[in-house]
Structures are given as C-alpha cells and as structure tokens.
Amino acid sequence: MKKTAIAITVALAGFATVAQAAPKDNTWYTGAKLGWSQYHDTGFIDNNGPTHENQLGAGAFGGYQVNPYVGFEMGYDWLGRMPYKGSVENGAYKAQGVQLTAKLGYPITDDLDVYTRLGGMVWRADTKAHNNVTGESEKNHDTGVSPVFAGGVEWAITPEIATRLEYQWTNNIGDAHTIGTRPDNGLLSLGVSYRFGQGEAAPVVAPAPAPAPEVQTKHFTLKSDVLFNFNKATLKPEGQAALDQLYSQLSNLDPKDGSVVVLGYTDRIGSDAYNQGLSERRAQSVVDYLISKGIPADKISARGMGESNPVTGNTCDNVKQRAALIDCLAPDRRVEIEVKGIKDVVTQPQA
C-alpha cells in the first residue's frame, strides 16, 4: 500500500500543469491512455519466488459530457501481464476489462479541471502455470465485476485536444481458488482525448442599422387653363382627371410621411389684390381635391402667389389685343405642387 500512496502523490503533483476544462455540454469525446500498472496483494498459491508486479498498462475510452460537472465514460483497460516464479511453480497472470463509470468534475479555471470517476469493471483474468516438479502446465481464467475508483486532472491543449493524468484503482480481480490469486490493481496513466463539437460558435453579427430614410422633393407644374376656366377657381372635369394622374405619382412619394405645398399663380391681367385672391382660391381647390383622394389634410397646404414669378418674362409686352394677350400669358397661369416625401431605402442582404 506504500507504493499506492506514492502513486497517488505523483498523480496529484501533476495537478498544476496537466489538466483541462471539461468538454462542452452534450458532446462526445474519445481517447487513449498509457501508464504504469501495479498489482497489489498478489498472494499466489505455492509461489515463493519473485513476482513482477509492475507492468505496462494501457487503455482506450469514450465519454459523453452532460454538463461541466457530470459525464459518463466507457473504456477498455489492459492491466498488464505479471510473471511470477516459485520453487514449485512458475507462471503468469494477466487481466483486462471493460469499465463503465460516472465522471464527476469541477472546473478550476477555463483550461483546468479536476475530476473523479466511480463505477465498475467487468474483467477477465487469465493464469498460466508450469509445475517445475511434474512438468505439467495448466491454464485457468476467471471473470467478474469489481468496483473502480479514479481521480485525476485534465488540461485543454486546444478546444478539441485534451490531456489527463489519472490514477485508477480496481479491487479484487480474480478468485484465488480458481486462478490462484486475487490481486488489486492501481493504474497511473497519461491520456490524450479528442472532443467532438468543440468548435467556436459562429459569431452573432449584429444587423446593419437601417439606412436613414431619404427625403425626396419633387415639383409638378399644371397649367391653370387645364384645371380651370379663365378667371375661375372651380376645377373642370379635365382638371380633375389631371389631378387624378398626379395623385398616383404623389402616392409613390408617400406624402403621408412628408408634406405637399400647392402654389397658385395668375397672370398680370387684373389688379394685384384680385389676382392674389384668385391664386389662393385656385390653390385651395386643388388642395381640397387631393384631400378627397386621400392625402391627409395636415400634410397639405395652399398658398396663393398672385401674379408673382411670371415665366413669360417680357415676351408679351408688345401684345396689345386682349385675346392675344390672354393666350400669350397662359404659361403664367399655373399651379405648382411641391412634394417632400420619404423614400424607403432598401438594402440588399449580403451574400
């Protein structure tokens, strides 16, 4: 048992440098181990010679990590072949088994984990003996189940690759009456494991902020002669048809999120006061009609501009006849509509 205590001390001494954090939750791992296998309390019957209790041990294992603290492992262990000699009999003993254990761990740091395993091993033990007196040889084997206890530390080399330093103890491997011995075994091993599904999750990319809405301003000019009879402010049928066409264009600009200003203009025939009033009435007629079509009343306004800002300039100064002057000044008689609307900017998703 003194050797067992030494082995446990060596295992714990590796704590500071050989360890790993537990795998991610609900992932699988597999690995292999190699180390020093030592048999204890061998007590061979009719054996009074040397027994080679220290052997090479090895194994393979696989496991499922439930969470950082709990996992389950299943593995195969080769515990080594132990020769012995005596004055009457020489022989060898070997043992191997399949174990199933619960693995209880505790993370010390992001890369360091200390753990214990508790469970059982289904083993097979074989002996081969040669009688030095009679020259006869015999082979025997035994099977059974024994408890398994293990403790160790793990260290993450990479997210997928891990190492472990472990000491494992298995009780009573064999029946002395069947195979001549009933030893215990301590296995100090260094293992390497590969853990599946440890890749970093794809980073969550924050969606790009929605582009600021684009404000568009458009100007429309309608001839008053199309909208109204001369010197009148009541819309003609053809004027309503013209505004119907205009409304479809305004809808595309979404005036509900913008504003509409209707500007009425007259020519220079008549007094300034009269022309100002006529331009206001004409602008209001257009506003009323567009409101009836669906433009919100709080988003549209009328403004009379009178005879200001003539577009004909001085081209009609020499026209004296009234009918001809009315025709010449027709471009000045107009309704201008200024629309400021919100246009949604649609961005294409990146591939």
UniProtKB/Swiss-Prot annotation:
Any one cellular component term from GO for this entry? cell outer membrane
UniProt-annotated location(s):
Cell outer membrane
Which Gene3D superfamilies is this protein grouped with?
2.40.160.20, OmpA-like domain
Molecular functions (GO terms):
porin activity
Instruction: List the residue ranges of the region (4 X 2 AA tandem repeats of A-P).
Output: 206-213
Q: Where are the transmembrane segments?
A: 27-37, 55-66, 70-78, 96-107, 112-120, 147-156, 161-168, 187-195
Query: Any idea where the OmpA-like domain is?
Result: 215-343
Topological category with respect to the lipid bilayer: Multi-pass membrane protein
- In the record for this protein, the sequence repeats are positioned at 206-207, 208-209, 210-211, 212-213
Question: Where in the chain is the site Part of salt bridge gating mechanism?
Answer: E73, R164
Q: Which cysteines are joined by disulfide bonds?
A: C316-C328
For this protein, the record's SUPFAM superfamilies field holds: OMPA-like, OmpA-like
Under the heading PROSITE patterns, the entry gives: OMPA_1, OMPA_2
Annotated signal sequence is 1-21
Q: Which domain of life is it from?
A: Bacteria
Q: Name one GO biological process term.
A: monoatomic ion transmembrane transport
Assembly with partners or alone: Monomer and homodimer.
Comment block on domains: The extracellular loops are most variable in sequence, and in some bacteria confer sensitivity to phage and/or colicins.
Question: What is the recorded function of this protein according to its Swiss-Prot or TrEMBL entry?
Answer: With TolR probably plays a role in maintaining the position of the peptidoglycan cell wall in the periplasm. Acts as a porin with low permeability that allows slow penetration of small solutes; an internal gate slows down solute passage. Required for conjugation with F-type plasmids; probably serves as the mating receptor on recipient cells.
Q: What is this protein called?
A: Outer membrane protein A
Gene symbol of the encoding locus: ompA
